[in-house]
Amino acid sequence: MKKARKIILSVIVSVLVLAFGAAAVLTYLIIPSVTFDFSSQSELTGRASGFLYGFAEDDIPSREIAESIGINSLATKTAGGLQHPIGDVRDVSDTFLSAGGEMLMVYTQDMYDTWYYQLDSLPEYNEKVRKTVTEMESSSYRDSLVYCIYNEMDNGAWLGNFWEAENRYKFYDAWKETYFLVKSINPDAKLAGPGHCGYNYDFIKEFLSYCKENDCLPQVVVWHELSDQSIYRMEHNFDGYYSMCDELGIERIPVCISEYGLMSTNGIPGESVKWISRLEKQDAYGCVAYWRLANNLSDTVADDVTPNSNYWVYNFYGKMKGKELASTERDILHSNIGKYLKGVDPLMNKGFIALASYDKDEEKFYVLAGGSEKDSKIKIENLGDAFTDGDKLSVKISYVDYKGLGGAVNSPTVAEIKYITVLGGSISFTLPCQRESQAFFVEIEKGEADSYKNEIKTVRYEAEYQSLDGIGATVEGGAYALSGGLCVKSISSETAPFVFKVNEKSGGIYRLDLVYGNVNSEGSERIAAYLKITTGTNECIVKCPSSIKPDCMECVSLEVKIQEDKEIKVEVLTEGCLITLDFIDLTPVSEEKVYVDRLTSRNTKEENAYFAVIPSDGYYKLSGITDDSLVTINGNEIEGNGDGIFWFGRGYNKIVLPEGVSFSGAERADYKVSSIDVYTPSETAVTGAAQISEDENTSSGEKFGWISSDKESGLSLLYKAPHSGYYAFTIEYANSEQGGYHDYNVDLVERYISIFVDGEKQGNFFFRSTYSWDYYKTKTVMLYLAAGEHSIEFTNDGSYSFNNKVTYAPDIGSITIIPVN
């Protein structure tokens, strides 16, 4: 058989060479491509937009940014669970569901505080299940629940080596008992299983056979895809699953891959395209694995309101409408051609992969693609009667590239707008791929468009390709996402400056994106690092927040002048910090506009919705708004004043306009009002054990700290509202609390502030970790105030607590109160 395959392949190659020539065959074999069949269409589900522990607390990340990616599923901690100090279903369900989420899966074994779960006994575990399920079944989110009652039992930690049949049947018996326990509480409850850490045909088939015989079939089948072979093998795995269902005579139960993706590649846009495409092709639910933090949609946002590069892949996916098109991939150099020729596996690819859909109502194609380091081809064939040869179609090609897990990417880049012609019932075009880390989004519709080609090029310089002579640093791989898979570690204030040799053809002003890691020396507290960036005679000092782990990449951006020597030196100034360098990107500086777009996520219900990614807190003018119509900003109805100027907090903002009103852009407004008030710690009244101290890292030079639930401490102030309406409370804060230890997850604690206006509680507002106490960010909360003077209190009332622990507010540098309009 192996010999036959080789003979067949050699015959095919020989025929191709004779028919088309060696150059054409070489092109066919080397150029990656995906061909879509317009005549073969199926439902587009959006189910791959799911996350394991994607939310830490209420609105962390924000419901608006989650809605924009069409979030579909969430796997998280059961009510009252102790596995992590965050992610309790009681606290995150409202954010998830209000963002449009569908499947809310809870891991009931996350009642335990250890990993892997420290078993007391199965009867005691079932009692924990009884307690948590009973509570959740009386909740407002019960109709969305799916109970994953056992997670990764095939690791053998509870019941012994799974390769021994006796131990597997111990698990099946335990499953049956817990299954009927949950069903006794709610006969209509949905349960998920077996929950294995990987796909094993024999194990899953045996489990389903047992469940059929014992009337305890799950309502959702769960396994994990966490292998570097998963992209290759996922279609094969699903084919095996479908065949076992047919053989057993049971329906094809919906599948949720409740943990997908690799620690080393999650967060890279081009890799995310692959997982999304594989899952969408199977109509499967999927949740991105939780390898690091629980407060960033599994490395899909930079913080609670800021997109990173990976965010845009899920934003693109959330925009896709209509029917999915069947596809055929070809990327021989990233395939398993060796195993195929040996007869081990069918021919499979994990390089250039794409997903496409067609919206009949809009007569529009959407293509999501990535994973190639060279120009790659997209073809859509068998267009039939929908298009006629000679029809002109406009093609808009946008892309994003990896900028670190924590690097802000406020917009995708438009690479090209062009038109193509239908020929022979098909269309084709080339994507200008440069790196496998890139992801492309293509929108194709009838009609010609003004041509555009982006001439502003970004050039990347990998740290591992630079000279390390005399520096004392090392080139290493990393556990987490890296550009090119390598980085330079252990650069410190005691090593020589690190030098990037750049070869820009001309000098000038460039935006420099420095992608780095920053950790403290062993045993010391996390701190931000100051780096000196030198280009010729120009120096710039930049503050780099902690990245918590050495190979978890953050990004800082600055403008630099490239001079004749074409060197960029990076020197660490802060003692006690170890810096990792991944790469720098250099882009010629151009005018940067606030990114604004229509909000067309599949989860968005409003007809006239937009979003804007705001670079910094302030007043912005929305073009086209000329009356006092109500404008809804992040769920708050704001009365306009005719000038279209509103206060926005930094990051992602959802804007809903009245019917018939639209705007095409936003720009910073030089707008001053007499009622803006900035309160520093020394200008407020202190209560309880709260303390004011100096802090050079805040805008005021001081901070307000130690606001705790057990000391009735806080700060209060008086504010006179000039008119009734919404006011922005922009709070400058730092938070670096951590609760517990985990082998790879970082158990950050999101502190909260309880705000009271005239004695009436407005809510608990959570503040995402800033990773160190010396790095401050801002969060904007919008509250309605009647005209007149108000007493406003900022405290932590202890109404929410993990495991009955004392709770704290973040450190506060200043509070700004200002009318939104």
Where is each model-derived feature located?
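Non-catalytic accessory regions flanking glycosidase/transglycosidase catalytic cores in CAZymes
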Residues: 2-105, 110-146, 173-193, 251, ...
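Conserved beta-strand positions
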Residues: 53, 76, 149-150, 193-194, ...
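Active-site cleft segment of glycoside hydrolase catalytic domains centered on the general acid/base Glu
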Residues: 58, 114-244, 264-275, 300
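Extracytoplasmic
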Residues: 449-821
